[in-house]
Amino acid sequence: MIIKQEELEKICLNLYPYFFDYKDITLHDINIKIDDYLHVKANLNYYNIETKIKAIARVVVKDQIIINFDGIVKYGFINLDLKKVLTELIKDNPYLQIEPDCIKIANDYIKEITLEDGLVKIELK
């Protein structure tokens, strides 16, 4: 399966409400660039305050899908560490596990994920 950057942006916009079911935190737009890494820029409305997220991530598939990432959340004029913010938001989500250096997602179906030239290539088991 091959997913283009634009398609991945649409998927994120559509899946956001399922993973982050907060009425006062809405995702307005997202921009994703793919090379050897995923580069993400997103704009949210977080309790009526414009919030910007910048992140870079690398995806590895083992027994789980492991997303190593780093980034910042600009909340008004305050810069926050993305890992700390996600740890708080995701702590009760049974599908995602946050560790100090990565997010882990249960994996029963994906054999490999490759990032290159604006594409995400997914090989199923």
Feature locations, PLM:
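Extracellular/lumenal and peripheral-membrane lipid-interaction modules
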Residues: M1-K125
